[in-house]
Curated annotation (Swiss-Prot):
Quaternary data: Part of the 50S ribosomal subunit.
Protein name: Large ribosomal subunit protein uL22
One GO biological process term: translation
PANTHER family: CHLOROPLAST 50S RIBOSOMAL PROTEIN L22-RELATED (PTHR13501), LARGE RIBOSOMAL SUBUNIT PROTEIN UL22M (PTHR13501:SF8)
Keyword Zinc-finger: no
CDD domains in the cross-refs: Ribosomal_L22
Keywords, in A-Z order: Ribonucleoprotein, Ribosomal protein, RNA-binding, rRNA-binding
Keyword Amino-acid biosynthesis on entry: no
UniProt similarity note: Belongs to the universal ribosomal protein uL22 family.
One Pfam entry name: Ribosomal_L22
GO molecular function, one term: rRNA binding
Cited InterPro entries: Ribosomal_uL22, Ribosomal_uL22_bac/chlpt-type, Ribosomal_uL22_bac/org-type, Ribosomal_uL22_CS, Ribosomal_uL22_sf
Function: This protein binds specifically to 23S rRNA; its binding is stimulated by other ribosomal proteins, e.g. L4, L17, and L20. It is important during the early stages of 50S assembly. It makes multiple contacts with different domains of the 23S rRNA in the assembled 50S subunit and ribosome.
Amino acid sequence: MQVLIKRNGMKRSKFHRERKEKLATMPVYEARAVAKFVRISPRKARSVANSIKGKNVSEAFTILEFSPKKAARLIKNVLKSAVANAVNNHGLNEENLYVYTCYVNDGPRMKRIWPRGRGSADIIQKRMSHITVIVRDKEAEKAAKEEK
């Protein structure tokens, strides 16, 4: 039988509290950043996102800097934010960081009407994206694996 603990009007189980305490003591070796509702088609952004997966952060910045695509500029800003989160919030070393994953999900679509001949109309869908970049520290990841 679960023991329910009432806190701030919400019921939480004992196991929930234990899991939360365990997660608080675990070492953090990854950071993430998300840009939501970005005005670019996910299909166009995914090719750029796939090009930086698994690369060192400095190498990924170089790839994005010299890419002529609009998505490269947007993903570069998200990557910069993820690196800042890793350094400032988690105290990770910037030289050891690499792009663990980078993915682009669909956002909502704005629907616009395009007038056509003979009084008809087409619907134009202006797409949005949610861009997520997760960076990890190679050294901290290795140390965590060795402890297990």
